[in-house]
Amino acid sequence: MEKDAKIYVAGHKGMVGSAICRALQRNGYTNIITRSHKELDLCRQDAVEEFFSREKPDYVFLAAAKVGGIMANSEALADFMYENMILEMNVIHAAWQNNCKKLMFLGSSCIYPRMAPQPMKESCLLTSELEKTNEAYALAKISGLK
């Protein structure tokens, strides 16, 4: 990436997104764009389209997600699947529409089968049953990858 490229980090307040921002800054990237959930609701297609149309990021790191523990994932399956799929599709589509050079979508270890051999390999994806407690989140992540 060019040092002066416009880089949007979605999910910059989370563990992974904040680490991406720190790594970019440490490596001399200064044109990093971030928005809090209050400033930009990634589940609202109109807001995402307007943001991408105005900002025109060259590169996008998609680290944003609705996350929760075992209890939250178990009690709100549909919410986790819906919100994650919507925000992923909104960002991926807006990046494509606005000629983003590259988009990095981040997965999770939970997208792999519950009993995947260690170390996990990409070829294990969708080969057997997912962990039930985060299946909805995992399926949303897999749909973004595919």
Whereabouts are the PLM-identified features?
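N-terminal Rossmann-like NAD(P)+-binding domain of SDR-like oxidoreductases, especially those catalyzing
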Residues: M1-K146
